[in-house]
Amino acid sequence: MRKWRIEDSEELYNITGWGTSYFGINDKGHVVVTPRKDGVEVDLKELVDELQLRDVAAPMLVRFPDILDNRIEKIANCFKQASDEYGYKAQNFIIYPIKVNQMRPVVEEIISHGKKFNLGLEAGSKPELHAVIAVNTDSDSLIICNGYKDESYIELALLAQKMGKRIFLVVEKMNELRLIAKMAKQLNVRPNIGIRIKLASSGSGKWEDSGGDASKFGLTSSELLEALDFLEKKDMKDCLKLIHFHIGSQVTKIRRIKTALREASQFYVQLHVMGFNVEFVDIGGGLGVDYDGTRSANSESSVNYSIQEYVNDSISTLVDASDKNGIPHPNIITESGRSLTAHHSVLIFEVLETATLPEMDEDFEVGENDHELVHELYEIWDNLNQSRMVEAWHDAQQIREEALDLFSHGIVDLKTRAQIERLYWSVTREINQIASGLKHAPDEFRKLDKLLADKYFCNFSLFQSLPDSWAIDQIFPIMPIQRLDEKPDRNATLQDITCDSDGKIANFISTRYVSHDLPVHSLKGKDAYYIGVFLVGAYQEILGDMHNLFGDTNAVHVTVDDKGYSIDQVIDGETVAEVLDYVQYNPKKLVRTLETWVTKSVKEGRISVEEGKEFLSNYRSGLYGYTYLE
């Protein structure tokens, strides 16, 4: 058998599919990141080793700002190419919805690099609007205001507009339009109004219900006519500058996008026919990320189109509708937060230990005093072959169930139960090996891989770092960041360190379909073994929660230049004291309470003075230490 090669690992984990030229494997068998076009690589294993020397421990989130820059340029260049090809005579605007990742360093990097592309921001709530207005005071780029609005939200936006901000209040419900008109009159400002339209068209994938008739937001055709009538009566026709639609995040099928664009383009045409000279069409989000690298509409974790195709369809549809009706081309706004940010962050954590189902030693021989069920199951194991494996499997299951029942009634002892257990799993493993080589294996054997997988216990919280994996079964690219020049010899599911049975990952990317286990390597003594989770830059940080009081992980910002990479910033993860403070425990008060208890215990002779000091020292240091295992 030939030696395992790097190319085999590339195929096994499909890194060339989802890596989008940013991720690969080097000759050392380590995952590398190439944030820029100039080809400068960052070896993730060497980066983690360097960070360990700096006392920055895993789990850690590694951010690559250069990838953010590259994503902005890529989308902007796609718009430029499509504009030239289709004779587009208006402007396009890239808008970053900060709900995707509100972390200040991420937003600031996007603003900084996006200035030359006039990149704008979107706020979907009052707190987000406060951030958006203050973080980019010098720019005349667009600010889109979505979400539910009250008087203070609207007043803040209108006063910002009065001071020169290009800010658009997008009406989600009719009552908002009345409120905007009222506040605008009080403040003596002509508001820039947008209206979100509820299209009949919907997206595809996990967020399909975000669009169409089931959409939470937007005005129906009847409500739109009511809004237009209201604006006309209030002498505010000129204030309607923008129409907006959104058919859902991570749209998997380009056909759904084309359908929605055709429908939206007719709303734009009809408004112009009615005398409302709308200038902007905000096509919302939906531009998906190919998480599994299959480029398939059949997968909820993939898309069957490129950024260029998405942009081409957006521009060509609106240009065609405008030209046919003799109206100006609209300025096109796209809110593609997921596509901008997903690739720039990598979560890295260490495997702490493993657990494997028991199996019988190969040299085991049944003894005269062993229970008859042990004899029967041993015979099945000893004579197992392909021709009778289905019958053998059924017999093994029956024997196991009978043994468990007898144990529960006190008829067989613990030793017998353990023997049955080891023999049963040995039979199961052999049947799985035989079935995996068959072209058409019986259905009942298809889940044996999942059943037999090892458990790799990892130092991270699924709920804090990968909430979408738990909540909506989102599949992220996951693979070891080292030893990729070695053939994986185990298959495992990943378990986090929360006290929750849901804290596990059991769905992974494979070359053809979703796999229920991940190919990994056996641990080598005390050598650290790291797993990387990729494309986690969208939503995961901000949606994460503190289940079991595990806080934010360490975060590291890494940039590259011609000389290599540099660690620009290290943001310490949350301490135990910080997360306790969130849930209204005062760390200082906790220490004082324990000091009183320890003093009392010393006086009662339960512990010595030295033991009391040691206990308090450990408690204090633990309070101000990392929430994860160190």
From Swiss-Prot:
Organism taxonomic ancestry: Bacteria, Pseudomonadati, Bacteroidota, Bacteroidia, Bacteroidales
Keyword Cell wall biogenesis/degradation in annotation: no
Positions annotated to bind substrate: V281, D282, I283, G284, G285, G286, L287, G288, V289, D290, Y291
SUPFAM superfamilies on file: Alanine racemase C-terminal domain-like (SSF50621), PLP-binding barrel (SSF51419)
PROSITE patterns (alphabetical): ODR_DC_2_1 (PS00878), ODR_DC_2_2 (PS00879)
E.C. number(s) listed in UniProt: 4.1.1.19
InterPro entries cross-referenced by the UniProt entry: Ala_racemase/Decarboxylase_C (IPR009006), Arg_decarb_HB (IPR040634), Arg_decarbox_C (IPR041128), Arg_decrbxlase (IPR002985), De-COase2_CS (IPR022657), De-COase2_N (IPR022644), De-COase2_pyr-phos_BS (IPR022653), Orn/DAP/Arg_de-COase (IPR000183)
Reported function: Catalyzes the biosynthesis of agmatine from arginine.
Pathway where this protein functions: Amine and polyamine biosynthesis; agmatine biosynthesis; agmatine from L-arginine: step 1/1
Reactions catalysed, as given in the entry: L-arginine + H(+) = agmatine + CO2
Cofactor: Mg(2+); pyridoxal 5'-phosphate
Protein name: Biosynthetic arginine decarboxylase
Organism (species): Phocaeicola vulgatus (strain ATCC 8482 / DSM 1447 / JCM 5826 / CCUG 4940 / NBRC 14291 / NCTC 11154) (Bacteroides vulgatus)
Modified residues (N6-(pyridoxal phosphate)lysine): K99
A Gene Ontology biological process term: arginine catabolic process
One function term, GO molecular function aspect: arginine decarboxylase activity
Protein family per UniProt: Belongs to the Orn/Lys/Arg decarboxylase class-II family. SpeA subfamily.
HAMAP family linked to this entry: SpeA
Key words of the record: Decarboxylase, Lyase, Magnesium, Metal-binding, Polyamine biosynthesis, Pyridoxal phosphate, Spermidine biosynthesis
